[in-house]
């Protein structure tokens, strides 16, 4: 299961590691999109809006958990790179202790706050009840969602990106089947979507734990589960900035959703659908971020920083190539693509406008995501937090607000606001990268 990524062709390692990661993201995004697609076939705009708003809240929570788990991926990868198996086991054990404790706390806190969350999201009145149902069920399933994601992060830190792909495939198939049963046969609406998502992840967790136990894929002693200050500090030092970074990104999306919600039900539904589509189109940038983090960390742990930099270069080039192709294609198929998720023609038109602007973000994000992965691999995840925070505060949110105010007839400028934020992030990343290289050069010469 453990794989050494510090030898051989860097490009080959990037491709071989990122492909299973890409397929994992594809499957995960597929079952996220399935909720919207299936409910759109059986329910009206209000239910579609409820699922889009509820799933956005859950997506925000999930990406923050995954961001926090980056500390585990990098710590395990660095230990694997230097051949320190005991350190890797300690990192795995402390990761389990930290995240399962956190999941229990989140379960109770979020259940208490679910009404306030729906209010803060400026949920249209017609969608309030469905959104509450969706969030209540998903919050109850938080321990499964957490376990589902940390198991994947542990495997990837060990250099294994294939096992998580298999576990996610199980969740995807189960989710789609349950969605049709709960929403199509039983007509449970948004509650059915939440049940399908939560139960499918629970099934995936149970199966993954059974496989791990049967094949003894991970060796963790009881002592490894005891909190160790030095291990916890490293997990949190890397993970917290990434979690905050991802949280701020999602907050900016939530604010944009709130702005769209205040424009009416049509624009609210359009933005919700496009967010799901963008999640699919961001598969390459997202997989490159995680690939650079894992491969870069192993090589840095092995004392081969030049291979980590080469990993960054190849990842950015691959992401840019795919991003350019997506930008070109979407200009011709944006409206029909949105129309697959709704029978409402007005929603399809508005969504097409938003997507044509937003899609530029997939090109720019490919570069800044690769940089973020590199900074995490170096243990400098604070830089990733900084450039995302600045882009949100200075570009994304103000840009979306001004676009909504001065262009009330179209969502195109709002989409461009997000892309502008990523372009700004690239500028900050390039400056930070140059400073890091200069300091490393001086350290070698001095």
What are these regions (language model features)?
Residues 19, 23, 54-57, 97-101, ...:
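Hydrophobic residues within alpha-helical transmembrane segments
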